[in-house]
Amino acid sequence: MICMAQKSPRAALLSGIRSTEPAPTEASSPPLRPDPKGRPMTNPLIAVAILYGYYLVTLLAVPLALRAFTPTPREFVRKTQHVAYAMSIFLLLGLFEHWYHALAAPLVLVVVGYPVLLLWERHPSYRRLLADRSRKGGEYRRQLLTVQLTYALLIAVFWGWLGPSWRPLIAVAVMAWGFGDAAAALVGMYLGRHRIVHRAVEGAKTLEGTGAMVAFAAAAVFVTMLVYAQQAWWVSLLAALLAAPVAATIEVFSRRGFDTLTVPLSTAVALVPLLLISRALGW
């Protein structure tokens, strides 16, 4: 009888063998536990309807209501949308059974939403209702494009390429950006006193804002790793201590709004070695 040799879990992990779409078996030694949020929906059309409905409510209806009926500051409205964008990653990861469906959803949204915003910018109601800070408009179009392409890239790499066991890392990276960047902007605007002066730093970024980003990004990473990725508390703490300074540093030196892309990607990449080591050591 000829016996086929099997690679050890550690060898399979370090050799970069891709995971298949079904949930990883015990022999594949995934770096993260499978997504704990139950079985995903199998009908992609229903998933898309829920996702786009969420965007319409949280990114359009709620901000419009805040602007029209409350004295909410414009920057607070913007950051409410920012956090809502970030939270949508849980819908992308939880509603779709296959990575390519989750990848297609944000790309289709860009194809549909980008020209709609472009046309709306020509109407006076756009400036009156939306908190667009750019002189000629286009901030919401650029935000839509950057956020959705960032999600598509993260899904393609950390779900499509590396396999479904890496999927929770996408949420961890996006939460670091979503809550960290929002805190940095609001704290920097209202409490910032010490401006960061450097030729590579764009805009009025402050030490107080950067400190807030470190704190909020660390908290977001810790909670997401512990609750969503189901990691041990000490692994979650190490991830928070590692990822938060990386995210804050990248945010300081990112220009023209590209922190939406650079912060989640750098956070995810920074956590990969830690997750590989923790799995190899059996944490």
Task: Tell me the role of every PLM-derived stretch.
Residues 25-40:
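Short, Lys/Arg-enriched N-terminal segments with co-localized hydrophobic residues
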Residues 54-56:
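Alpha-helical transmembrane segments
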Residues 7-8:
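Polybasic, lysine-rich low-complexity intrinsically disordered segments
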Residues 42-47, 61-104, 114-221, 226-227, ...:
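Interhelical loop and helix-boundary elements at the membrane-water interface
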Residues 109-112:
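Charge-biased, low-complexity intrinsically disordered regions
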Residues 13-14, 32:
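Leucine-biased recognition of intrinsically disordered, low-complexity hydrophobic segments
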